[in-house]
Amino acid sequence: MKFLLSVALVAFFMTGTVTAQKVSFGIKGGLNVYSIHNNDKSLDNRPVTGFHIGALSHIHLAEKFALQPEVVFSTIGSNYKYGPDETRYNLSYINVPVLLQYMFKNGLRLQAGPQVSFLVHARSHTGDIKSDIREDFRTADFGLATGASYLVPNTGFGFDARFNLGLSDINKNGTFKSTNRGLQVGVFYLFNQK
């Protein structure tokens, strides 16, 4: 996992050396509304609100197409109710999406692509009891990201909305399949877009 994250970070930061005139770097942040979906229908599953913050690179491939790799710290989770007990799962990931964008002249961008996520923290809360549950989850999650963004012309500022769908089972020890899915909304700033 550390090797894959290192390769992703090196590739992310080396994009500027390849075609500096077509690459922009930026920062982003915002809110998450996520839940961990599973096939155990006896659990009442409700979403959890979290946040995300990270860096992005915007690489123009052609007049209307761009590639946008990102490295983003993201907090997600789920609330489960089983009988009288309620348990909250809080998970933190480093997400590395690589999005292909179609850019309209008015600043609107449609985007989609694969995402790999690396688990960095996992805790559960049931009443006053807090537990480290990282060993219960797989360290990597593979999924798809799709959404839209809007870059305000001549400012570098933009808005982003995205749906992330986990495709792999993140539950390491359970008898049921669990996948992450959720919405992200946020803002970003590209440094050399003015």
Where are these regions (language model features)?
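Residues on the lipid-exposed face of transmembrane beta-strands in outer-membrane beta-barrel proteins
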Residues: 27-31, 51-59, 71-73, 96-102, ...
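Signature for the C-terminal beta-barrel architecture of outer-membrane proteins
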Residues: 172-193
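Flexible, solvent-exposed loop segments that connect beta-strands
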Residues: 36-45, 75-93, 119-140, 169-176
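Residues that define the transmembrane beta-barrel architecture of outer-membrane proteins
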Residues: 21-23, 45-51, 90-94, 138-144, ...
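Short glycine/proline- and aromatic-enriched beta-strand/turn motifs that initiate or cap beta-hairpins
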Residues: 19-60, 64-67, 164-166, 192-194
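Outer-membrane beta-barrel channels and translocator barrels
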Residues: 62, 105, 152-155, 192-194
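Helix-adjacent hinge/juxtasegments
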Residues: 80-112
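Bacterial Sec-dependent N-terminal signal peptides
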Residues: 1-28, 187, 191
